Amino acid sequence: PNLRNGVIEHMTLVPGGNKCYCGQYGCMDTYCSPETLLEDGESLSGFFSVLRQGEHDHRKRFDHWLANVAQAVSNIRALLAGDIIIGGEAARYLDSDDMDRLKSLIDEKSAFHDTRFTLRKSLCVEDQNIIGAALRFVQSYVTDVCNTEV
């Protein structure tokens, strides 16, 4: 009815925190975006490559980022107590140990400890936005040919 969708990435995670591109301060995006892991000139794949080699500074940045993501998920679950899918580019680089650790951090930060929810990564492939955008143009054709809904 209001012709808008939610923008959860602009919920305040840290009151008075980092300035966001939206003009507010402390938005989740300024703490949970994978770009917050990177230093000048560093790529996300490069960051995770160095992290997996055990470099201390990268581990420290990753631990801080993971704690922020856990707090954000805990806040979201306080309102919407459902399963969680971690998506976006960073999900491509998270391994099973990272996901187990994230679930543990979420539980630690939750008011009512409940590990019965499912936490998983989305299927993240290169150019997924392009593929997703194209789907609406071929959906009826695929449905007709495959005799199934896409």
Label the predicted regions.
Residues 1-31:
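Glycine-rich phosphate-binding loop of actin/hexokinase-like ATP-binding domains
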Residues 19, 28-150:
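ATP-binding/phosphotransfer module of carbohydrate and carboxylate kinases, centering on a glycine-rich
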